[in-house]
Amino acid sequence: MKLFLFLLLTATSGLAGEWTIPLAGNTYRTAPAPGSGINRAGKLVWSNPEEVHSIYVHLDQAATFDVALRGASPTPVRWKLASANQSFEIEAEGADLKDYPVGKIKVAKAGYLKFDLSGLKKTGANFGEISDLILQSGNDDLKLHFVKSNKGNMFYWGRRGPSVHLGYQVPKRKNIEWAYSEITVPKGEDPIGSYFMANGFGQGYFGFQVKSPTERWVLFSVWSPFKTNNPNAIPEKDRVTTLAKGRDVRAQKFGGEGSGGQSFLKYPWQSGKTYRFLTRVQPNDDDTTVYTSWFGDKEANEWQLIASFRRPRTKVHLTGFHSFLENFSVNFGAEKRLGLYGNQWVCDTDGTWHEITRARFTADATARGGHRLDYAGGSKDGVFFMKNGGFFADRVEFDQWFEKPSNPETKPTIDFKNLPKGEPVSK
């Protein structure tokens, strides 16, 4: 009996860990262009032999794996799976899902591991369907991070990637009326889906986005005090009102992640250039607050009004000054983005400017839950920075403070009285 137990333990010791990685939350089409092949059932289905679908998983140390694919194809197909400088071909046939052994791979270091999946041969309309990548390892200390399930719609949020934030330390016991900041996006760090948010506050946000290969927006939004994701459900008394907007700016209601007033300008902002953002917060005696934002190319020394909104049931000065970086396109969650957030200042109601030199780096539930580990932020070369996506290795822990050196010479010089007032919309 003792010999039997010994042999049993010996035979199973190579299977100390097994992980099932669902493709629905961890896979991107990476060639010939970013996209998705995941169907509504959460399975990868594709027919183009030129496509490559990449699966990502994070390891905390070097490891050796036995690899398998869980899939099905009613007609004979041949798949190719490449990872860690090794490549395998897998023959598959069968209408029901089953596990197809791939082979053994050895990974030399910790970090993100990518598996590139493609189709070599098909006899039907497509290369079948694949639901999971299965990894087995004899290392019982090994930890893997990936999107494990769709709980909380995490297949969607996980494929978007982690969002990161910088919360700025502003002077206490001061009524802050103005917030100023600058963003520079380095060349090549602005994939589709990027939102570089510059001036965030307790009731809204202001920044710029990459909407498509040919379209970019400057976006300024203010939430209604009425909590809903359906803007049509907001009572008249709780609606955000557009007071003015700049030339070519579109103002409308929005929903989905809270609801309220939204304005945007289609503007061809460029990576490698520095842009500046200015937001004014004016509380009124009738328990409303007016939020107004301007945008401009720093080098051109220009300002243009984006919009001015009035928010009901609100009487506050600037609160919660922050910036963030997010990706809003699930098909571009494997692309890295980087923003340099610099020269933050606030101006109080007495007209005194205060420089911001401290910021707290935080992250969303996708990062905090360990679903994605490709996030970073901090201070470097005199500015704050944030980075996410792309499955990079140099992660920075969230919930820590960073400082940048003071530079009083960069204090904004703004003629507040002569800022563009735009086109009145309503009273």
Predicted features along the sequence, with ranges:
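Sec-dependent N-terminal signal peptides
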Residues: 3-12
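Extracytoplasmic
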Residues: 17-268, 278-283, 287-427
